[in-house]
Amino acid sequence: MIAIIDYGAGNIFSVKNALDYLGLECKLTSDINEIKAADALILPGVGAFPAAMNMLEKSGLIDTIKEEAAKKPLLGICLGMQMLFEKGYEFEECNGLGLIKGSVRYMDEPDLIIPHMGWNKLEKLNECPLLENIGDNEYVYFVHSYKAECANENI
């Protein structure tokens, strides 16, 4: 079973509908025991980094997520992926989960219109099982104003 972590923020129903469509067993949950029993975890998210981390902290799930991430696959989607990093800098400096070394910062890119929205080619720098069915330079849709800055071993 895949646990979709419900901490009060995020696109949880879109994620659940997608997994249901694919025929995957999944559950929306904020229950620590269900998260521990899951085979894999998904941390969705929409909104601002500090507010989402505050909601995650209030849910009491931070320690459980960190512990379980060491044992099983964890996929962060959108803001959920950003929260996996050590810090975020949206509005203010804010601690993340610290599962990935690095930080999430505003995209100060003079050649891009921010927010960055639209179809762009995905550049794969390393082989990754999550992307094995996606060809090189395929178009994917982006909607973001922030970027992850991390050490090369995390890319």
Where are the language model's segments positioned?
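N-terminal beta1-alpha1 ligand-phosphate binding loop
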Residues: 2-24
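Short, flexible loop segments at the rims of nucleotide/cofactor-binding pockets, characterized by
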Residues: 18-25, 51-55, 117-121
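Generic structural signal for residues in well-ordered beta-strands
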Residues: 26-28, 104
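Structural alpha-helical scaffold elements that stabilize or flank donor/cofactor-binding regions
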Residues: 34-35, 68
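An anion/phosphate-binding loop that grips the pyrophosphate of nucleotide cofactors and donors
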Residues: 38
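Structural motif
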Residues: 42-44
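Cysteine-nucleophile active-site neighborhood
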Residues: 47-117
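Pocket-forming structural segment of enzyme catalytic cores
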Residues: 86-155
